[in-house]
Each structure stands twice: as C-alpha cells, then as structure tokens.
C-alpha cells in the first residue's frame, strides 16, 4: 500500500493549477494547422505577400550528411508555413443599379414597339437577363409570339357564336343506318380474317391404312361372391356365442375390411380399325364337319354303338344279336371276305396310309 493512497488530502491542493494553465504557452500546431482557430476581423479575402505563400525548405535539406553545422549554439528561426484558408467561398455582391448602355435614338423607338408586342413575362424580366440572352434566340421568341397571337385572332373570328341544335328523328335514323352499314362491313372483314386463319392452322396428319391400337389400363378387381354359409344347429355342439363374444370379432372384421385397399388388376385392350386386319392377324380355321347321325338298320333308331367285326352301327343288344347271326349265315354261304382272310395268321400287315384306317379295310355287309 502506497503512502499517497493512505494519507489525508492537502487543503491547498490545486491552487496553482489555474496559474499554470494561464502561463502555458500556446502550441504552434493549433495556431498554424488549417489556418488557425482564431478569427481575424476583416479577413474577407485571402491576401498575403509573395514571401508568405512561398514554400520554405528546411535548412537540413541543404546540408549534406557528411557536413556538420558550424555553430551548435545558434537558435533555429521559427519555421513559417503557408496558411490555408478554410472559410467558404462567397460570391461578390451584384450591383443593384443597372448599367447604362448607349443606344442610338432610332433603336430606342424600335425597342418600345417590341416591348408592347412581347408578352408580360418577357417584359417583367430584368435588363440583365435580356442582355444575357442571345440576339437570335430573342428574335425567334418574338416571331413565335406574333404567330401565336395571329392564329388566336383568326380562330376567334372564325368561330363566332355557335349553338348545337338537337338532331331530329329522321337525322338520327340516317346516322343509325350509316353506322349499321359500317358495322356490317367490319363484321364481314372480321369473319373473312377468321376463316383465313382457320385455313392456315396446321391440320393433324391422319395415318392412312389400318391401325392397331394397344391400350393398357388398371381396373379394380371384382371378386366373385363365395358360397353362402348356412348355420346348422346340431345338438351336442357348443352353445351359440353370446352378443358380448361376437362384438369384438365383428368390430375387428369391419376394421380389417376398411383398412385393406381394394385390389387392382391390369387389362389390355387391342383394337383393330377394320375386320380385314383382324382376320389377317387372327385367321379362323375351317369349321369342323358335323358328323352324320347314323341309324341302326334293325331298329331304325339313332345308332349308339358300332360292331367291331362288321362295322355296322346298332342301337340295342337285340339288334347286335341279329347282326351277328346274319354275319354267320353270310360266312357259311360265301366264306370269309378277302380282307378278313388276309388278316389271318401271318406277318402283321403294313401300317395303313394316312386317311385310311381299319374301317377302310373292312367290308361292310349289307343285311337284307
């Protein structure tokens, strides 16, 4: 802890401070920089001697580095610097009295005439503004003003009192007829332009010839209704569930059905422009031959069977027995047919040609 911080302050502290401030020398920097901070009376314009405005070079620049000054005790002279004026520029006041211009007597009369012809705005202007204007500009302005006055006078004479009278009904009808004709012509022109515009519109080119269109879409899947279940009461089985037991199951089924989105399936459609193209790509085969309905020769009914030996159709067992008995009598009288004897013991016959079968090799026996 220092002694100055612990002792009591002196009663005479600061008495000599005001004297020191008054005795303090004014700094040369504040007196010379930017022209100084003191205002001088009557310093309207900057005036200075030629010696004040010239820049002075320090004496140190004239002496070489190797040379030493001859005397160290000589006092250096105060350096004088150029004073800079910082006050705002003021324009000199204009004299209120107009300057007199000597003009001949003949020109004064002409000027009076021009003054009467010029507008009031040009007459009220001061003499300085009139003299500053170029002579050619003033002449053009005067001529323009004269032309405007002349036109205004002519228009007043032409107009005179004018009263518009109301049109009669006949005149209104004439104007309406003329307007109607103009509107009709305008409408015809508009319609003609619209027709020309439609003709110029590029029409879509149609593809000549047959067209096959392929179109694939997604459609919701519709399920087939399942078989309806019937409740069957059987004695001895579990009792019917109560309403409390069915409630949660019913709610669960409804929620599951609502949460499950419907299924979708794709469908593809192929469209042909004409039937000829369809038949070309999907040719139809020859219609199958309708088999001839054979009749039993014994009962004259539609034959349901065929005898493998005689190849004769028959309808009933009684007809079959009659056919076999007739076949035995034929063999006894005429013997076996040549095809039957050839099919006896021996090597197997060659394979039949296409279109020929065992029925073609058999010889039908006509029963009388």
Swiss-Prot record:
It holds the Pfam family YL1. Residues 127-142 have a biased composition (Basic and acidic residues). It is found in: Nucleus. Residues 1-164, 339-361 are annotated as: Disordered. GO terms for biological process: positive regulation of DNA-templated transcription; positive regulation of double-strand break repair via homologous recombination; regulation of apoptotic process; regulation of cell cycle; regulation of DNA-templated transcription; regulation of double-strand break repair; somatic stem cell population maintenance; transcription initiation-coupled chromatin remodeling. Residues 40-75 have a biased composition (Acidic residues). GO terms for molecular function: DNA binding; histone binding; histone chaperone activity. PANTHER family: VACUOLAR PROTEIN SORTING-ASSOCIATED PROTEIN 72 HOMOLOG, YL-1 PROTEIN TRANSCRIPTION FACTOR-LIKE 1. Component of the NuA4 histone acetyltransferase complex which contains the catalytic subunit KAT5/TIP60 and the subunits EP400, TRRAP/PAF400, BRD8/SMAP, EPC1, DMAP1/DNMAP1, RUVBL1/TIP49, RUVBL2, ING3, actin, ACTL6A/BAF53A, MORF4L1/MRG15, MORF4L2/MRGX, MRGBP, YEATS4/GAS41 and VPS72/YL1. Component of a NuA4-related complex which contains EP400, TRRAP/PAF400, SRCAP, BRD8/SMAP, EPC1, DMAP1/DNMAP1, RUVBL1/TIP49, RUVBL2, actin, ACTL6A/BAF53A, VPS72 and YEATS4/GAS41. Also part of a multiprotein complex which contains SRCAP and which binds to H2AZ1/H2AZ. This is Vacuolar protein sorting-associated protein 72 homolog. It comes from Mus musculus.
